């Protein structure tokens, strides 16, 4: 049987990186990060000028960290270096230039397809960030899940955990 990952994270931005590192440190050893760009943190790389500040708070929202991956204010360069170090130190398997075309659940596994490969996982987290374009499902999200499914953080409230 092909390799089955404990977790595949789609999206190599700060949230996706934190997710795979947290998962690995929590005991999920077989994790994979898939990113459509040629490296992680595409928004920071493409749209932040050199030496631009990168702050952990967004629009004045408190960003208390509840995991083991810390995030501090810094510059574009120090932030990218920090994420490089996290991926290297944890030996995270990451594939770049790997845009996900589909995610389908069959039995107990998710089948994740890119243009160049197919992967299987017990769990999938979609963390596509600002530049991602999710294909929202054509079915209604059950109301019981509305508090854990979010396509936009523009309206998050002060103190809300996301």
Question: Where do the protein language model's features map onto the residues?
Answer:
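Glycine-rich dinucleotide-binding loop and its adjacent helix/turn
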Residues: 1, 128-162
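N-terminal Rossmann-like FAD-binding beta1-loop-alpha1 element of flavoenzymes
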Residues: 2-33, 162
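Active-site acidic short loop of glycosyltransferases
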Residues: 4-5, 121-122, 159
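Short hydrophobic core segments
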Residues: 8-10, 34, 112, 118-132
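Conserved Rossmann-like nucleotide-cofactor binding loop
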Residues: 15, 39, 131
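Short glycine-/acidic-enriched loop or helix-start segments at secondary-structure transitions
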Residues: 19, 43-44, 105, 135-137
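Short beta-strand "acidic-cap" motif of Rossmann-like dinucleotide-binding folds
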Residues: 29-36, 44, 126
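N-terminal Rossmann-like dinucleotide/flavin-binding domain of flavoprotein oxidoreductases
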Residues: 45-117
């Amino acid at each position: 049987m092909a390799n089955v990952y404990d977790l595949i994270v789609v999206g190599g931005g700060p949230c996706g990186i934190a997710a795979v590192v947290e998962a690995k440190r929590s005991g999920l050893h077989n994790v994979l990060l898939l990113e459509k760009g040629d490296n992680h943190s595409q928004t920071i790389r493409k749209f932040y000028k050199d030496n631009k500040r990168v702050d952990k708070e967004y629009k004045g929202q408190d960003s208390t960290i509840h995991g083991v991956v810390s995030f501090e204010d810094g510059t574009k360069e120090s932030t990218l270096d920090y994420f490089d170090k996290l991926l290297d130190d944890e030996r995270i398997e990451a594939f770049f230039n790997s845009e996900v075309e589909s995610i389908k659940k069959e039995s107990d596994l998710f089948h994740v397809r890119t243009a160049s490969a197919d992967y299987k996982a017990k769990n999938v987290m979609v963390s596509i960030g600002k530049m991602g374009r999710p294909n929202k499902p054509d079915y209604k999200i059950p109301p019981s899940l509305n508090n854990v499914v979010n396509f936009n953080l523009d309206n998050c409230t002060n103190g809300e955990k996301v």
